[in-house]
Amino acid sequence: MMNPLIIKLGGVLLDSEEALERLFTALVNYREAHQRPLIIVHGGGCVVDELMKQLNLPVQKKNGLRVTPAEQIDIITGALAGTANKTLLAWAKKHGISSVGLFLGDGDSVKVTQLDAELGHVGLAQPGSPTLINTLLAGGYLPVVSSIGVTDEGQLMNVNADQAATALAATLGADLILLSDVSGILDGKGQRIAEMTAEKAEQLIEQGIITDGMIVKVNAALDAARALGRPVDIASWRHAEQLPALFNGTPIGTRILA
């Protein structure tokens, strides 16, 4: 079996029917032409934010990571492992793709511990067991994995989806693409940067060009590239016609080098 490809979906994508239609059409086209097994890992920040708003609950962030108090973890689990995950499974079904919905704890695929008591139920993801997902891939299924995990003590944890995807890629020896709303990392003039090293990233963070959530994304991609010993791509789902080429290894966004 070729080494798998993990496609990590950014939260806003789940809010856009047009984006989902483009993505799943690209997935169908790619699967018809290539044997490479695919896995989707998703967060769903926008789904969670919308639910929090409806329930009048505060959304707090610390260094770009969502603070998850004990009284909110059930709600966030429902939004990510429930609504967001099943929405993606429904789109897969609509496009004739046999898919299976999972969370990080299924088959111990990704091990999770608490990251920081101040963040509450926020987990640190580490590689786990490849057995379950490899079994599903061998059966021709598309695993769709939410970024909810569970500790050995049975505590549910909200995990940053970029970091969850990195840990799963390390588990499976997979390549990783981080799909988001931006066409890659942009320089001070709004131009796409084709390749990025750790040194270049540090400079741009110091200069205030890479900020907030993008710092988390770049650091996750750098961590992933280091952990996996191979480049990681950050790209946009907006260029659907380019996605099959991206899935096949052609960079269309920013390639993060280890």
UniProtKB/Swiss-Prot annotation:
Protein task: Catalyzes the ATP-dependent phosphorylation of N-acetyl-L-glutamate.
Organism encoding this protein: Klebsiella pneumoniae subsp. pneumoniae (strain ATCC 700721 / MGH 78578)
Marked site (Transition state stabilizer) residue numbers: 8, 217
EC number: 2.7.2.8
InterPro entries: AceGlu_kinase-like_sf, AcgluKinase_fam, ArgB, Asp/Glu/Uridylate_kinase, NAGK-NC
GO cellular component: cytoplasm
Upper lineage: Bacteria, Pseudomonadati, Pseudomonadota, Gammaproteobacteria, Enterobacterales
Subcellular location: Cytoplasm
Binding-site positions, ATP: 181-186, 209-211
Pathway: Amino-acid biosynthesis; L-arginine biosynthesis; N(2)-acetyl-L-ornithine from L-glutamate: step 2/4
Main enzyme class: transferase
Binding site for substrate: 44-45, 66, 158
Family stated for the protein in its record: Belongs to the acetylglutamate kinase family. ArgB subfamily.
SUBUNIT field: Homodimer.
CDD domains for this protein: AAK_NAGK-NC
UniProt name for this protein: Acetylglutamate kinase
GO molecular function, one term: acetylglutamate kinase activity
Record-level GO BP terms: arginine biosynthetic process via ornithine; L-arginine biosynthetic process
